[in-house]
């Protein structure tokens, strides 16, 4: 069950006393099921108290349930399947060939790419759109303090990266009757998705990126060690840009005055967002860095770090710092961390347990008041508190960075964070809503 207690899950590598079903009981249950006539056992770990084992997020290693599934196999004569991040073709094939399991259980990867098996069969592994284990589209049931549990705004069983899943008619791509010249400003995920969709419909697409690399802020988002699937997704998008007839203009910083010179029938602006700036004393000191600067490794941190902001990015940065052996304090002005709607409880629960396991200090209802060279001052219910540190990482959100305003007469469309800051699902689904039939 991977339980330390009621509503207490164990994380990989943690030593603990099993509170729920242990291996011995699992053997007994498996034999009972076999005797009752079951044809196959689909084995994984977890309970609702350790939900992240049954629905593993990106913080969980690939094939996380394979050791326990293979343990069960010798005790029954019926086939044993293993589920839980088993989508790596080589890893799955090896587990089958070596007799550890009899079958592989895969669900989310098929939502993300329905041609998953066909691409493996055709030896086109690089063409597979990878599931990043975000749960934002398929299982976004969320909970946090003040919100005991709620359903996401979209139905379950969808995919953040592939809006076509269960919406084939709504998002059916057809060849355009009239070919248009399309200019896409910004080479992040939103810009690349828009360029991809417009090219697939037969339009002539030019993509303008101000830097020398595609990816935008997602390059930083994919940087932590546990985001290997994010990096694979970024590579997938770059490969799609190469495969499709899209002209990419690198180091082209398009200004509003240049839009009329592009000769485009439609202009899609996907210029992203910029970090929010806190107007507090000491915020401009050299040891204070933005989240994106930390993730891009533009600046290193010391050994004693305060992370400001307990949203998803701030918590992931705190975890990433802890993995490096840093002493981390996480401060959040709200009464709970990870107060993010549609963030699956599987993801948030595991991240909370990782923060606990790595002894990351968490201060709630603790707004940042000032920064000094060797400490920060936060607010508390009783007044103020000084926290010693040698580095401060700010993760306090973003503000839209719209190049221009949307203009239907000039056929200018805003897409993604430059219009409204959101997550990966928000920008990809918005791209489909905008581009299909444009």
Task: Mark where each language-model region is.
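Flavin-dependent oxidoreductase catalytic cores
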Residues: 1-185, 189, 193-200, 205, ...
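Rossmann-like dinucleotide/flavin-binding elements
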Residues: 176-209, 214, 249-266, 270-280, ...
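Short, hinge-like loop/turn segments at secondary-structure boundaries
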Residues: 58-61, 99, 121-124, 223-227, ...
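Short acidic, glycine/proline-rich loop/turn micro-motifs
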Residues: 7-12, 52-56, 217-223, 280-282, ...
């Amino acid at each position: 069950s991977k339980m330390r207690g009621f509503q207490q899950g164990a994380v990989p590598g943690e030593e603990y006393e099993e509170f729920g079903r242990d291996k011995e009981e699992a053997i007994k249950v498996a034999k009972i099921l076999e005797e009752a006539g079951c044809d196959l056992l689909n084995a994984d770990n977890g309970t609702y108290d350790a939900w992240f084992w049954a629905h593993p997020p990106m913080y969980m290693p690939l094939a996380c349930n394979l050791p326990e599934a293979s343990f069960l196999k010798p005790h029954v004569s019926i086939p044993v399947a293993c589920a839980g991040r088993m989508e790596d073709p080589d890893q799955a094939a090896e587990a089958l060939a070596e007799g550890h399991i009899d079958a592989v259980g895969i669900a989310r990867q098929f939502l993300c790419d329905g041609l998953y098996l066909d691409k493996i069969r055709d030896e086109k592994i690089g063409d597979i759109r990878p599931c990043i284990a975000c749960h934002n589209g398929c299982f976004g049931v969320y909970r946090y303090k003040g919100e005991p549990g709620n359903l996401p705004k979209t139905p379950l069983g969808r995919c953040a990266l592939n809006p076509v899943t269960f919406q084939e008619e709504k998002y059916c791509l057809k060849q355009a009757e009239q070919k248009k010249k399309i200019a896409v400003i910004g080479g992040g995920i939103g810009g690349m998705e828009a360029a991809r969709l417009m090219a697939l419909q037969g339009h002539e697409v030019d993509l303008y990126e101000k830097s020398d690399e595609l990816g935008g802020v997602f390059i930083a988002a994919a940087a932590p060690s546990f985001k290997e699937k994010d990096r694979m997704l970024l590579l997938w998008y770059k490969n799609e840009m190469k495969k499709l007839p899209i002209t990419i203009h690198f180091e082209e910083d398009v200004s509003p005055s240049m839009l009329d010179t592009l000769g485009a029938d439609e202009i899609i602006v996907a210029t992203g967002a910029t970090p929010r700036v806190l107007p507090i004393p000491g915020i401009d000191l050299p040891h204070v860095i933005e989240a994106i600067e930390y993730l891009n490794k533009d600046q290193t941190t010391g050994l004693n770090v305060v992370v400001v902001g307990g949203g998803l990015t701030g918590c992931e940065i705190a975890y990433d710092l802890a993995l490096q052996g840093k002493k981390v304090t996480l401060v959040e002005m709200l009464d709970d961390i990870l107060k993010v709607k549609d963030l699956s409880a599987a993801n948030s629960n595991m991240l909370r347990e990782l923060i606990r396991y790595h002894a990351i200090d968490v201060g709630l209802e603790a707004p940042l008041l000032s920064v000094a060279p060797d400490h920060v001052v936060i607010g508390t219910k009783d007044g103020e508190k000084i926290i010693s540190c040698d580095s401060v990482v700010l993760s306090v959100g973003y503000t839209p960075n719209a190049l221009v305003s949307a203009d239907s007469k000039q056929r200018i469309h805003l897409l993604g964070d430059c219009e409204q800051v959101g997550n990966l699902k928000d920008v990809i689904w918005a791209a489909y809503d905008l581009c299909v039939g444009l």
